[in-house]
Regions:
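Catalytic active-site module of serine/aspartate enzymes centered on a nucleophile-bearing elbow/loop
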Residues: 210-229
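Conserved alpha/beta-hydrolase
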Residues: 24-46
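The serine-hydrolase catalytic nucleophile loop
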Residues: 11-26, 39, 178
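Conserved alpha/beta-hydrolase "acid-adjacent" motif
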Residues: 173-179
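Catalytic histidine-centered segment of alpha/beta-hydrolase-like enzymes
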Residues: 174, 202-213
Length: 229
């Protein structure tokens, strides 16, 4: 079986988005199997309730896809990688809390602390960051969901030290650059190998296009080195 990459889109996006198609095409042309998935309430997947659960349920979806590759397609876990963009990168990082059937992950402008992300987004939109607290309580009381239960830190700490590749646009105004700093610290604290490519002139996931040639070379090399032949 060829090395296989699961590709995960961002919020309100789908497997048909230009970013997912571009990254998937690069990987496919380089000899990888590619499975671009739709998270629940996105694209062709079931519309469960129309709510985004900060990766809590979405990581169930990514874990189910990875486990399906192992259990139904007989692809060894050491041949499977995951690549996610934006909030799909958050889901990618959370997947390790649900399954260990993968060997490496790559993420593009990943949020790491969801609470911080929401507060920053509220401020960006002109709302008081303090509104996050009632949103969190609403999710717990009326939706029965703890939006901060499964975090990248929890997943990485309990994982198999799968290496991480990060692409980060330093001009990102939606997922601020400190999230990548936080991820680097989490990885280092847990003895996980992490490689970062940071771009001072790029915004949110823009380096996929602005540094497309470098992106292709780096991600292909990363997965070839960290997935078994």
């Amino acid at each position: 079986q060829a090395k296989t990459i699961v590709v995960i889109h961002g919020l309100t996006s789908s497997k048909y988005s230009s970013g997912v198609l571009l990254a998937s095409g690069i990987l496919y042309k380089s000899g990888f199997n590619v499975l671009a998935m739709d998270m629940r309430d996105h694209g062709d997947s079931t519309c469960e309730d129309g709510y985004y659960s900060a990766g809590q349920k979405e990581s169930d979806d990514s874990a189910a896809v990875v486990d399906w590759l192992v259990n139904e397609k007989n692809i060894s876990a050491n041949k499977i990688g995951i690549y996610g963009q934006s909030l799909g990168a958050l889901t990618t990082l959370q997947t390790g809390a649900k399954t260990q059937n993968f060997a490496a992950i790559a993420v593009h402008d990943p949020p790491v602390a969801f609470e911080t992300l929401v507060r920053e987004e509220m401020e960006f939109q002109g709302f008081p960051p303090s509104l996050y607290t009632p949103v969190l309580h609403y999710a717990r009381i009326f939706r029965g969901e703890n939006l901060t239960e499964v975090t990248p830190e929890v997943a990485i700490a309990g994982g198999n030290k799968q290496p991480i590749l990060v692409f980060n646009g330093m001009l990102d105004k939606r997922v601020l650059a400190h999230h990548t700093d936080d991820l680097i610290k989490i990885a280092n604290d847990n003895g996980v190998e992490i490689t970062t490519y940071r771009y001072e002139d790029m915004g949110h996931v823009e380096s996929l296009w602005g540094y497309n040639e470098e992106f292709g070379k780096v991600i292909v090399s990363f997965f070839n080195e960290n997935l078994s032949s």
